[in-house]
């Protein structure tokens, strides 16, 4: 389970690393898609917290 969560985290991170600089470099694109990036950032932070909790629980067992 943790491996799948980490893989998802890697894919979201790769997507953000590629798309955010492109959106910032393209005139007007950041304003148009700011809410989408905000949701992606929130998902990324949430996933980090879920992975930390899952790892803590699995190591305590």
UniProtKB/Swiss-Prot annotation:
InterPro entries cross-referenced by the UniProt entry: PSII_PsbZ, PSII_PsbZ_sf
Official protein name in the record: Photosystem II reaction center protein Z
Keywords assigned: Chloroplast, Membrane, Photosynthesis, Photosystem II, Plastid, Reaction center, Thylakoid, Transmembrane, Transmembrane helix
Membrane topology category: Multi-pass membrane protein
Keyword Membrane: yes
Gene3D superfamilies, alphabetized: Photosystem II PsbZ, reaction centre (1.10.287.740)
Superkingdom per UniProt: Eukaryota
């Amino acid at each position: 389970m943790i491996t799948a969560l980490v893989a998802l985290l890697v894919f979201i991170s790769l997507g953000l690393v590629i798309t955010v600089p492109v959106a910032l470099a393209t005139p007007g694109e950041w304003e148009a898609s700011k809410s989408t990036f905000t949701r992606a950032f929130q998902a990324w932070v949430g996933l980090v917290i879920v992975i930390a909790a899952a790892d803590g629980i699995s190591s305590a067992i």
